[in-house]
Amino acid sequence: LCELEQYISKLAEKSDDKKPNKRDTFRNFVLNNFDENHKLFTLTAPTGYGKTLTALNFALKFNKSRIIYALPFTSIIDQTYDIVAKIYKNSDILVSKAHHKTTIDEKNLTEEDRYSKIKFLMESFSGEINITTLYQLIFALFGNKNKDNVKFNQLKNSVVIIDEAQAIPL
């Protein structure tokens, strides 16, 4: 939580406008209305209001084992991962990304490691913050393969964020 708040503060410092902006107002409203007794939330705001970081900030307040951040498009997953990984690069928080185009840089891995730790983290939602596709989340809930069962078990004591839910094909 601390790293994220520092990142958000740095963004505000870089802004030419020193008065509270729409993002600050939106984030403060969301965070001030946090109620851990509720289990389901919706977050709706126009583009540019900082929903991604606000949702992550909100999810961190629950103090659960992990966050599963599901998005519909690989481009948004990559963009979100880049931001979140940058925020937590100097911390012990493990941020993982998994979609069908995710690759592992295997040139520095031993044969033993090639299909162990990194691949397991990518495919199992075992990081503290896991950024993935809506399809991976759906497979975790309804899949019938062993790797889906591993993901399903990781949903316990987790906060699940479904971003751009309107993009789910029904």
What are these regions (language model features)?
Residues 1-170:
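N-terminal helicase ATP-binding lobe
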